[in-house]
Amino acid sequence: MEKSATRQKALLIALPLLFSPLASAVQQAVLDTRGAPLITVNGLTFKDLNRDGKLNPYEDWRLPAAERAADLVSRMTLAEKAGVMMHGSAPTAGSVTGAGTQYDLNAAKTMIADRYVNSFITRLSGDNPAQMAEENNKLQQLAEATRLGIPLTISTDPRSSFQSLVGVSVSVGKFSKWPETLGLAAIGDEELVRRFADIVRQEYRAVGITEALSPQADLATEPRWPRIDGTFGEDPDLTKKMVRGYVTGMQNGKNGLNAQSVISIVKHWVGYGAAKDGWDSHNVYGKYAQFRQNNLQWHIDPFTGAFEAHAAGIMPTYSILRNASWHGKPIEQVGAGFNRFLLTDLLRGQYGFDGVILSDWLITNDCKGDCLTGVKPGEKPVPRGMPWGVEKLTPAERFVKAVNAGVDQFGGVTDSALLVQAVQDGKLTEARLDTSVNRILKQKFQTGLFERPYVNATQANDIVGRADWQQLADDTQARSLVLLQNNNLLPLRKGSRVWLHGIAANAAQEVGFIVVNTPEQADVALIRTHTPYEQPHKNFFFGSRHHEGSLAFRNDNPDYQAIVRASAKVPTLVTVYMERPAILTNVVDKTRAVVANFGVSDSVLLNRLMSGAAYTAKLPFELPSSMSAVRNQQPDLPYDSAKPLFPFGYGLPH
């Protein structure tokens, strides 16, 4: 009843005015409300969000976003301003990360009504888009009931590909399923990336998401780094082009935000990919990005694609840039979220960025005890804090340092009491908070949230994962395959007898193969595997989830054993999911064909292997020849390992 009443109210407002004399001068905005009263001024209708019976400038949809934001800030208390600078994790019952299918509305109400938080990341499942949309509507209803009626910005990590990892990405559910961004980079088509992001934008808006914590503009210069599969590879020029296309599609154009945009938060400024020894800076043991030379410019260049597309947000890296300097001047040894040079002097000053700087999650929290050492055997690790370089400061001092560095909003935090206290104690000025709050609220106005915070949940299932979009996603999966080796094996013939490892038998049968039980019975063996990895840090929350360490196939690797077994009996094709650059030296000497993939379904893969069409995708990073070469390359430089087995840009046509 409530949903249909909301829609009915919006229609009653909009339709009569289309035929009024006022329509020729000012067209009535469509307004959605589930609680805020409406007022009429000069024949036009507005929301009375603060319920004072008057039309205030921030409620006037005719005014520019900047003017509305300034008026709203002038009406806010210090606590309300501090709340805007928090970006929480939308709570679900029984999950510390916010995973699940329904929000904990009581916990959410505390955050929204009592702590004044109005930005949240959602980690809800996408298996039921209509339910997800209505859950987000419920959060917006809580926000509409607050004193000023400020709507929520709901964000998400990527949820459109094969990867799913807490703190990185979300399971795809019913959303269209594409290759990882590495696959888009392998294709190298900026317009395709724009189209991909435009589709994702429409899916996000359909379920009430208006902010994407993506893309990664990080350069994959350290082959062991666990976050490579979220990047566009290791080439600055290619990554710049891909990032520009992504932001353009996500924000619905190159000219800044509009009412159909999804805010793009480009990350992680800057140098994150130069991870020392490949360890990730979500973890204390990986808090350094290693710069052996002054190579920071390599890592900055991809972000210029974001600036050209007027990206609305930037997220700083957790990492400390060890040994990095800028024009001979050393860079302060603190994480980028605390680094005034990186955020204010370089990002805002030199590169002119004027959007929102959103910190990565939990940078003001402590990292003590098992956060430093890992939990004891049998204990379950939980996420703590990432205050790298400022561990000795108090949480209150970290807030002050981050704000003074240039941070506008704090990821993963909902308690703003320390920020309020810092202003009351004279450590920060309220005017400085006003600057950040203005930036954040302006984007809410630009994206149309004050007029239309709700979505039509009944339409979400028809929009999310649309058949024509998934067909394009499947075509993109196929295009992204990189042919590394083919000794007269491809294309495969329909009706061939195949022995499978890592591929579903029904998928092979559906495309016309005959599945057999042993390699000896087969005409060809088809093996799916992934880049090898180790997990030496299972006693750390993120370390227990990251794929770290060696990139080489060891003799005890079950997939490698399948390769050895099959290739001794029958021509063998191996496809490797390249979440990191795999070392294939002891694979290519056994196989007849090798295909790199970056996320592909069995059916798309098998159909492509039977096609005689030329392969056009190219490697977005080099594939090293050995772990010795990996250890000896410089983590801050692209494509610099000795004698790579396959260089950057490699790919056979046939």
Curated annotation (Swiss-Prot):
Keyword Signal: yes
Residue positions of the active site: D235, D360
EC number in record: 3.2.1.21, 3.2.1.37
Pfam family name, one: Glyco_hydro_3
PROSITE patterns in UniProt: GLYCOSYL_HYDROL_F3 (PS00775)
Keywords, ordered alphabetically: Carbohydrate metabolism, Glycosidase, Hydrolase, Multifunctional enzyme, Periplasm, Polysaccharide degradation, Signal, Xylan degradation
Entry GO CC: periplasmic space
Protein name per UniProt: Periplasmic beta-glucosidase/beta-xylosidase
Classification via PANTHER family: LYSOSOMAL BETA GLUCOSIDASE, PERIPLASMIC BETA-GLUCOSIDASE-RELATED
Protein's organism: Dickeya chrysanthemi (Pectobacterium chrysanthemi)
Record GO biological process: glucan catabolic process; xylan catabolic process
